[in-house]
């Protein structure tokens, strides 16, 4: 019998993994080495550091992380120990891209970003960056890419140098956090880059907090800042928080569909590793597959609809108020943040006009 220990916040972990052995659920922040001594499979999220301190001397042979990144996993050590591991790359790509669109809609409403002839730079064009690029193009942005490692691997990929991005209207960061090698991203956005950006340009980080030197950003007064990730999370620089136009607690990828996607990806890896058959209970997963109905009123445009679904300005104010009262509330806010529905899961009623339908199609509603 397989013994499985899982983070209790992984959606549908009981329904998917409960048939395969003994399943133990525990908060990810409280998982310790002694919990894993007789455990064969560990299912976790980014809140748990998976390294020698956690796994040394345990029976763990499979690690599944329901996350799009793996900064929290010591993959080198796991490989040396012949511990198989899997994660969920790209599971949250649509959710993050739609978070960016919500921010764009908010910035449009505040006249902080041009609606016509706007330009954007995507720094880090992997799973998420590709989707963000595609979605921005569909609403009229001219998009430039910066991803030197990808350009080195793909001869047809054009990576625009950072120094050529001084005049773009929107800079979106979607790189992993890399501290070594030929293409480090730690503090990639530094004082020099920030000074280069034109006044009024928007810097949006929904990747990794330490890709921006937050102290340099604190001294930067000519750029509009939108941050979902923060250097030294879960501690947030309160001075920087007050300067941001949009501030959220690392929730850009938080959609119901992204969470389910991530769980299913590690579920498939688990089945493959242990040579098991799929027993997923579709009826019990149905609620995350159903559409949400949203009533739209006459005269509304696509941006109004986006901001009805998720308003970054309102959420930013909520975060500021919460952290002003208690600076240690970041993880609480993140843990209890309501999951959004992706646009594909939203049914609009009554049927939009042909003009609004075209506008909604451009923004990604189908």
Curated annotation (Swiss-Prot):
Catalyzed reactions per annotation: 4-phospho-D-erythronate + NAD(+) = (R)-3-hydroxy-2-oxo-4-phosphooxybutanoate + NADH + H(+)
Name the Pfam families on file: 2-Hacid_dh (PF00389), 2-Hacid_dh_C (PF02826), DUF3410 (PF11890)
Q: Which cysteines are cross-linked by disulfides?
A: none
A single GO molecular-function term is:
NAD binding
Task: Give the GO terms filed under biological process for this record.
Answer: pyridoxine biosynthetic process
Coiled-coil regions listed: none
The UniProt entry's GO CC annotations, sorted and at most eight, read: cytosol
InterPro entries, per database record = D-isomer_2-hydroxyacid_DH (IPR050223), D-isomer_2_OHA_DH_cat_dom (IPR006139), D-isomer_DH_CS (IPR029753), D-isomer_DH_NAD-bd (IPR006140), Erythronate-4-P_DHase (IPR020921), Erythronate-4-P_DHase_dimer (IPR024531), NAD(P)-bd_dom_sf (IPR036291), PdxB_dimer_sf (IPR038251)
Q: What is the active site of this protein?
A: 208, 233, 250
| Pathway in which the depicted protein is active | Cofactor biosynthesis; pyridoxine 5'-phosphate biosynthesis; pyridoxine 5'-phosphate from D-erythrose 4-phosphate: step 2/5
**List of residues binding substrate:** 46, 67, 254
Signal peptide (from-to): none
Q: What is its main location?
A: cytoplasm
**Enzyme Commission code(s) on record:** 1.1.1.290
Tell me, how does this one assemble? Homodimer.
Function noted in UniProt? Catalyzes the oxidation of erythronate-4-phosphate to 3-hydroxy-2-oxo-4-phosphonooxybutanoate.
The name this protein goes by in its record = Erythronate-4-phosphate dehydrogenase
Q: Which organism is it from?
A: Coxiella burnetii (strain Dugway 5J108-111)
């Amino acid at each position: 019998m397989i013994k499985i220990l899982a983070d209790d916040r992984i959606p549908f972990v009981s329904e998917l993994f409960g048939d395969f052995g003994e399943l133990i659920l525990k908060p990810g922040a409280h998982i310790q080495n002694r919990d894993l001594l007789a455990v064969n499979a560990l299912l976790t999220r980014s809140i748990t550091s998976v390294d020698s301190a956690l796994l040394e001397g345990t029976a763990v042979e499979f690690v599944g992380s329901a996350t799009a990144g793996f900064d929290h996993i010591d993959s080198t050590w796991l490989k040396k120990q012949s511990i198989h591991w899997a994660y969920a790359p790209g599971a949250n790509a649509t959710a993050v891209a739609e978070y960016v669109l919500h921010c764009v809609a908010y910035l449009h409403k505040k006249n902080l970003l041009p609606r016509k002839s706007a330009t954007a730079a995507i720094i880090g064009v992997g799973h998420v960056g590709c989707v963000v690029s595609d979605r921005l193009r569909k609403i009229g942005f001219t998009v430039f890419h910066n991803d030197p490692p990808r350009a080195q691997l793909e001869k047809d990929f054009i990576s625009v140098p950072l120094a050529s991005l001084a005049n773009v209207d929107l800079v979106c960061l979607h790189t992993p956090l890399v501290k070594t090698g030929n293409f480090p991203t730690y503090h990639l956005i530094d004082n020099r880059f920030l000074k280069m950006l034109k006044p009024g340009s928007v810097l949006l980080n929904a990747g990794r907090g330490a890709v921006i030197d937050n102290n340099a950003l604190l001294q930067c007064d000519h750029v509009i800042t939108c941050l979902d990730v923060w250097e030294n999370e879960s501690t947030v620089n309160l001075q920087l928080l007050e300067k941001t136009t949009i501030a959220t607690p690392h929730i850009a990828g938080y959609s119901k569909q992204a969470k389910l996607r991530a769980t299913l990806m590690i579920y498939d890896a688990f089945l493959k590793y242990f040579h098991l058959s799929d027993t997923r209970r579709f009826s019990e997963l149905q609620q995350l597959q159903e559409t949400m109905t949203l009533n739209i009123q006459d005269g509304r445009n696509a941006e109004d609809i986006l901001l009805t679904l998720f308003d970054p300005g309102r959420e930013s104010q909520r975060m500021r108020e919460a952290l002003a009262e208690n600076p240690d509330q970041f993880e609480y806010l993140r843990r209890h943040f309501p999951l959004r529905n992706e646009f594909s899961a939203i049914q609009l009623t009554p049927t939009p006009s042909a003009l609004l339908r075209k506008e909604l199609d451009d923004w990604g509603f189908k």
